[in-house]
Amino acid sequence: MVEAEEGGQRHSAKLVELAELQPGASVLDVGGGYGEPSLTAARTIGPEGRVVCTDISPEMLAVARERAADAGLINVEFVARDAEELEFDDESFDAVLSRATLMFLPDVAGTLKRLHGFLRFEGRLAATVWGPQPVVQFSAAFPVIAQELALPPPPPGRPGAFALSDPDRLAELAAQAGFRDVETGTVSVIFETESPEQYTEFIRDVAPQLTTLLGDQPTAMQERVWQKVTDAYGQFQGADGRVHTENQAIWFKGRK
């Protein structure tokens, strides 16, 4: 649901700001999904620049490609590939961006080292991950599904939405990968939909792993669980009926 995803524009704008993108730059987006921050970066660097938007999901990239075409952006390429399997020549990019992706990777340290290699001298990395679960309101669906399926708590260190919610750990990983002048901070990401039902649709779109968890369950149970998820998002519903969630993301940046 792109309409709700557009609520993360502040998220994308922050990444572009941190990367200090200039007209004509070459940019790699790792985990670009429905097209952000790629499209924001493409507008910033202009037609002489180049953005390579990568994601593991061809379906999401198909939407991103349509959005780029609708916006008249001709400087974006799309590559469907796992973030840990990207292959580019060394020193191919002026900047690497990644929005809410790295925490899902089994080998974050190795991936950061490879991204460092893709950058030209003085090139910049700018990335975000989600903060701790209590300050990420869209995660209200997670404990509901875990309770209904009697899922055990994930073991420490396992990839997941909140696996990199420690800023100090992020800074350490970036420095170990070779990045200099590493800094971290936070940005508030707002997601809004017209109703709790629409918010559940949004979550199912952007977090397909939740649908996968329920995939083997009887249809009646799936419907019951999704209704409970919708009920959970009702706590964020305003008097106008709209659902408004505030979600803290942690950003970090560094240069080669």
What spans do the regions from the language model cover?
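Conserved class I S-adenosyl-L-methionine
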Residues: R124-L151
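A short glycine-rich, Lys/Arg-flanked "PGG" loop and its adjoining helix->strand segment in the class I
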Residues: A109-R124
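Class I SAM-dependent methyltransferase SAM/SAH-binding core
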Residues: S26-L86, A95, G110
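Conserved alpha-helix/loop element of class I SAM-dependent methyltransferases that forms part
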Residues: E6-A25, T40
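Conserved hydrophobic residues forming the short capping helix/wall of the S-adenosyl-L-methionine
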Residues: I45, A68, I145-A146, A174, ...
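Conserved Class I S-adenosyl-L-methionine
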Residues: E5-Q9, Y34-E36, R158-K256
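A short SAM/SAH-binding and catalytic strip from SAM-dependent methyltransferases
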Residues: D94-A109, G131
